[in-house]
């Protein structure tokens, strides 16, 4: 059984390894895409927003389908749809067609989330927090490797589209692999996030309280890493005068920080630290990091802050879903879809809002705006932490 669970999880983790690339692939190829579609960086940010719009349109139905027909069909379908996006973008002759492919990427992402997170919770009920956080680990590795692949293609004067075609090919192969695997049955009651005991609540969790706080955290956690992934290189160019090639490397430092964080969480969540504490600690770290980044514009400091931004935004969304499925376990797929809908709203609104701010000539103001989002996330996490302690009667 354990071997079967690991094989099934590995197929889902492969999906997320390449989703890590997908999340930054448009921003990382901004120069090539602006020329191909005759647009500007703000236009690319709107295509990125279309991915979030695709997620928003389908997260609700994806969550319901996950509970109705099972996790496997959604996970398999997501890989196929994502491959279509990756092949379609470099071949798109127009901005409008690219927008359609971006919508498909959002559909794929929603299906992937609604199928994968509940499945991991059911595969590893005594370590669901660690299993879900490892999703972010694989995404971070993929995101860290993509800039290296793009640099390799540029150095060898190769078509930028190969950075899209390689993950597309692996997604297609993964469909075959996933189709041979067994997925868990639905509606098993989970154990406490990353703990060995079943959750024992002193009172029934209230969706209007704990659920609302988790939805807010789902929004802010996605907003924080969305802003960094799109605008961190541009901010470094404007604030510290870094060259374009050097500024893109900040995304690698960001991804390394993310990877370090989730590997640490994968160990700590199963032994010493409860997920609810991380949802409070990490936004506080983000606040401190943004404060330094906004006031100190030395290149080496930006490298360090990029690392800590990646570190403090990594895994929070995954932990949020783990907590939501723990507190409201009877509808794991549905509540996953609700949190993911909040996340998709952030994926839509943040590229649009920050694109407008950038167009007004204030990239520094983007990260001041980001600081405000971190404040909201911290407040929601503090409320959740307080409520969780009351529900469990334990030191969270």
Curated annotation (Swiss-Prot):
UniProt-annotated location(s): Cell membrane
Main location as per UniProt: membrane
One GO cellular component, as annotated: membrane
Segments traversing the membrane: 8-28, 44-64, 73-93, 97-117, 133-153, 158-178, 213-233, 250-270, 276-296, 304-324, 338-358, 363-383
CDD domains: MFS_YdiM_like (cd17396)
Organism: Bacillus subtilis (strain 168)
Keyword Transport on entry: yes
Molecular function in Gene Ontology: transmembrane transporter activity
The family this protein is said to belong to: Belongs to the major facilitator superfamily.
Keywords per UniProt: Cell membrane, Membrane, Transmembrane, Transmembrane helix, Transport
Protein name: Uncharacterized MFS-type transporter YfkL
PROSITE patterns given in the database record: MFS, SUGAR_TRANSPORT_1
Origin organism lineage: Bacteria, Bacillati, Bacillota, Bacilli, Bacillales
InterPro entries for this protein: MFS, MFS_dom, MFS_trans_sf, MFS_Transporter, Sugar_transporter_CS
Pfam families (UniProt xref): MFS_1
Membrane topology, as annotated: Multi-pass membrane protein
